[in-house]
Amino acid sequence: MKKVIALDIGGTNTRVALINENYEVEKVLINPTVVGNLDLFLQNVSKTVREAIDDFSGVVAIAAGVPGRVRHDGYIYALPNVHVTSIPLSEYLEKEFHLPCFVRNDAEIAALAEANVGPYKTYKSLYFVTISTGVGGALCIDGKLVNSSYEVGHTMTSYHNEIHEFEHMASGTGLRRLADMNGLNIANAKEFFDLVQNKHPLALRVYKDWIKMLSDWIEMNQENFSPDVFALTGGVMKSKDIFFEDLKRACPSANIVECACGQQAGLIGAAVFGFQNAK
């Protein structure tokens, strides 16, 4: 059976898994990510792969998801949370292991997982959205990524007669900015949603604005791309019991669901990408 070595590289940990064609995880290893030094970062990724995989028979590719902008040849411009730039990850791993290596942004990788494995794989088109410290997203059609330079979080939006980047207002951290603009001081998104749940008058007003901003953005993308489903994930979904039904009611033309792959999305999506691109 063919297999892919899947990597999920984050600012804290690097996860490596051996995944077969049925998207079953056969082996997995987690090591701390080395930050601040490019050479040591690359060496640590290679070391983690070697520690995790002792038998390369059947392996057709290495594939990785990373939290940064990636050129289509696997060159990473920067990993802000890892504090390294100009990273030739694909080239480095191909030389190390003599296997083709494919690298994409972690949001795109997670989108592939949702579009190919689990309950939403029956949809022809899926728009993946993650709302945490920022806003990320990707569109899949027939289980494959639609390549685009469109960065969803950098969509411009108007608020109080000023123009802002969408993620600067609607993300988890953006909620603090949105609240501050209305005279509400909060430490984080959790505190904000607690206030909403307790019907704090000012928090409810900000909440109404946030729901409208997010729903307008989803409706705009529904009109532009007509996906069969929007799959949402990210830190704000920890408060889904408070806002999710309100958001769905505010988006009558969109089919909005919660992502299903959870913590495995990065590894499963990387495996999908590897199998799709391996010759």
Each language-model region and where it sits:
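Adenylate-forming
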Residues: A110-N116, G136-L139
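Beta-strand initiation motifs
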Residues: Y23-K27, K144-Y150
